[in-house]
């Protein structure tokens, strides 16, 4: 394949300047926020290289150089070398636990003299390239056959497994954002619903375990009720014969009535056995109807309870796999335990800082919670609380607005691509940003457990910043292949 020769003047003329402007505003605001978060009264200036803000500014300068080099490279070259890059990063991920030092129970950082690198960040970049390369294959259609879906899932899951071996759960979860890309490329929304339903099952099964209904832990009881409700809703969607829906609803209603009467009569009902039997009989009936009438869509409501109930019983096993401090953080977020001086300390102090900022904030460098170091990690994962305290509600809204604008701009670039590679890659980057943005803000305000997800362009970190700029550099590179907008 021959590649286009690209000169610097051509890059400056064809670059997507609105996206560049938004990005510049964010990285500049990020350096200022890091300076504010790490500032003390005896500290040197913002650009002093001995301080976090100065180091971040140096990383920005180096990253801009890297980004400009990327812009000078024909984007088709990234498509050509996507798989080799992906394989090299997988090898690096495999090696990392054997050479990385143990830092807070995780072996995910490779130390090279004064510099530390996190291969998981490079894996995000490489996985996006590999996924885009797969989709750009000749006549590749994700939904055409199951093997295509399996290949896409394998590309996403391999780095997840290797990163989990490093005990770096937060970084591994980031790759789940790529399933939004699969949805954009034609996968059924049923799988996204399944992912949301799995999260609901996980939360309910863990949170409601202290009490019981009919001898069943309260969480599991309501999950089973929810499974029956989902089966009925799916029958509305996938079933064209009213008698099947009527029979299933009637079976559920009759079973509930019998159980209620027996309970009133003082009969000890083995609740779990009965409910599993009721759901199981309904699932077998639907499978029989699917085979008898060649209505294969009925297999969806027939198999859904099997998968959901299996996952419900495996929740405790999955929860036990987590590190003790991760379990405690989840319990604190769900309100199972209160530990304001331990696992819940960061989040509690963060919420105090944001709440004290009010509408307009306390002013630049005038924060009390942040300046007195009440919030740990405030220059990395919890940097948003510095913004909320010093700049207030309006400052926080401006930052959120910049994120929304950048994500929408990347999506626009994706939708206007001539090439499948460019479209899928841009959507991968947008999905990463959405995940980081939502989870980090959720962590800071107590809606999500603290899992070490930084805020892109704002949190301190050279590796993450360099990879984010490289990702944006390729997005800007492929943006030169955008379809022209139609004149109105």
Features from the language model and the residues they span:
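Short, Lys/Arg-rich, polar N-terminal cytosolic tail immediately upstream
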Residues: 1-13
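Short, charged juxtamembrane terminal tails flanking transmembrane helices
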Residues: 2-3, 482-488
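Helix-boundary and loop/linker segments of multi-pass membrane transporters
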Residues: 11-12, 148-149, 372-375, 417-418
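Hydrophobic alpha-helical transmembrane segments of multi-pass inner membrane proteins, especially
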Residues: 22-25, 32-33, 42, 46-341, ...
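Transmembrane alpha-helices of multi-pass inner-membrane enzymes
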Residues: 28, 229-234, 446-483
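Transmembrane helix boundary and interhelical junction motifs in multipass membrane proteins
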Residues: 168-173, 362-367, 378-380, 451, ...
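TM-adjacent membrane-interface loops and short helices in multi-pass inner/ER membrane proteins
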Residues: 329-383, 391-395
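Pore-lining and gate-forming transmembrane alpha-helices of multi-pass membrane transport proteins
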Residues: 385, 396, 427-428, 456, ...
